[in-house]
């Protein structure tokens, strides 16, 4: 359990797990749940679920959750954690079988497995990609149910994440092997829990998802683009950071490019999100902010909680206008990661330390 002290009260947040993830909401989960605790809600949409920690938390607390993301690996994690209705121990035999396999050099070893002192940077040591090759091919050969396969794949990705030699993403790799990369790949049973059977997992564009579902509460944490005006058009997109997990899920052995051996479909023209768009439209408004405006307007929920990073594109005035167009802004909070404190936003001032990457903002809207 995560503990969180606020106004002399201690809140317990259910334990969750996930990979190292640039968009992880692990640190702000207590703040999210504190805000939500005052609401009378049953159904929740986690619109950009990513590593699924937010979805896991709501599900463990008894809410009916719709977990949505466009990433295949996020869908797999969501299925493993949110759709399981069995005793988790039933999956241990699968994990044990996969751990017992002998590794061999296959597609993953060819592209992502490195050895000591050869002068080339790789995300994993060869001994572990060999095990990955064997395990991933075996998963496809086994007669697994959808949930069993999701559990096996989630376990595999968690294991790979624990022996990588990266900073947490896969667009560049460390010059020297990380200490954890020397460990042997070993799968363990994910920390599953028994669900109520009412959760739903969706892999779709968020605009399609909000049109098809009505919920009491929606949480949105889009992959915002940088507010750096000097950011070049060729910058790496969010989806590209985790291209390797897509390859693990699909096992499709795609064509790759560049020094990091990224998937061809992780290029900007294939994988870019409108929420990451750093350009302005013909009216001088950031395209990403217009996407937020559209999302809030089209979401069928009584309450919407929007996360926004201090590194994003919005100006104070623009975001304030967007939030109030489709409802009433009833709460605005600023979180200082370094100080681990939350305080009300001062709308009469400029963004507080707006160039500080350690700030996160939470905006609660009640739709009209």
Language model feature labels by segment:
Residues 203-208:
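Conserved SAM/SAH-binding loop
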Residues 317, 328-368:
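Class I S-adenosyl-L-methionine
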């Amino acid at each position: 359990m995560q503990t969180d002290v606020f106004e002399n009260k201690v809140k317990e947040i259910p334990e969750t797990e996930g990979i190292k993830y640039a968009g992880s909401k692990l640190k702000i989960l207590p703040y999210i749940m504190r805000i939500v605790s005052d609401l009378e809600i049953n159904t929740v949409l986690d619109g950009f679920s990513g590593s699924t920690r937010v979805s896991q938390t709501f599900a463990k607390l008894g809410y009916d959750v719709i977990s949505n993301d466009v990433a295949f690996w996020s869908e797999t994690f969501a299925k493993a954690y949110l759709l399981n209705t069995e005793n988790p121990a039933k999956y241990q035999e699968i994990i044990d079988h996969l751990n017992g396999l002998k590794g061999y050099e296959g597609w993953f070893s060819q592209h992502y497995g490195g050895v000591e002192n050869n002068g080339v940077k790789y995300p994993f040591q060869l001994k572990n990609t060999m095990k990955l090759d064997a395990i991933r091919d075996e998963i496809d050969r086994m007669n697994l149910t959808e949930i069993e396969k999701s559990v096996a794949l989630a376990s595999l990705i968690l294991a790979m994440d624990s022996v990588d030699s990266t900073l947490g993403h896969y667009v560049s790799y460390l010059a020297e092997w990380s200490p954890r990369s020397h460990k042997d790949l070993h799968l363990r049973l994910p920390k599953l829990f028994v669900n109520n059977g009412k959760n739903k997992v969706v892999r779709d564009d968020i605009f399609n998802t909000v049109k098809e579902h009505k919920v009491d509460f929606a949480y949105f944490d889009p992959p915002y683009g940088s507010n750096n005006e000097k950011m070049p058009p060729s910058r790496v997109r969010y989806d590209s950071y985790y291209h390797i997990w897509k390859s693990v899920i699909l096992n499709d052995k795609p064509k790759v490019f560049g020094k990091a051996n990224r998937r061809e479909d992780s290029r900007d023209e294939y994988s870019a999100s409108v929420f990451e768009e750093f350009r302005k439209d013909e009216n001088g408004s950031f395209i990403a902010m217009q996407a937020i405006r559209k999302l809030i307007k089209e979401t069928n929920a009584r309450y919407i909680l929007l996360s926004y990073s201090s590194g994003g594109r919005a100006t104070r005035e623009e975001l304030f206008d967007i939030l109030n167009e489709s409802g009433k802004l009833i709460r605005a909070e600023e979180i200082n990661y370094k100080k681990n404190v939350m305080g009300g936003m001062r709308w009469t001032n400029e963004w507080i330390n707006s160039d500080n990457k350690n700030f996160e903002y939470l905006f609660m809207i009640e739709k009209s």
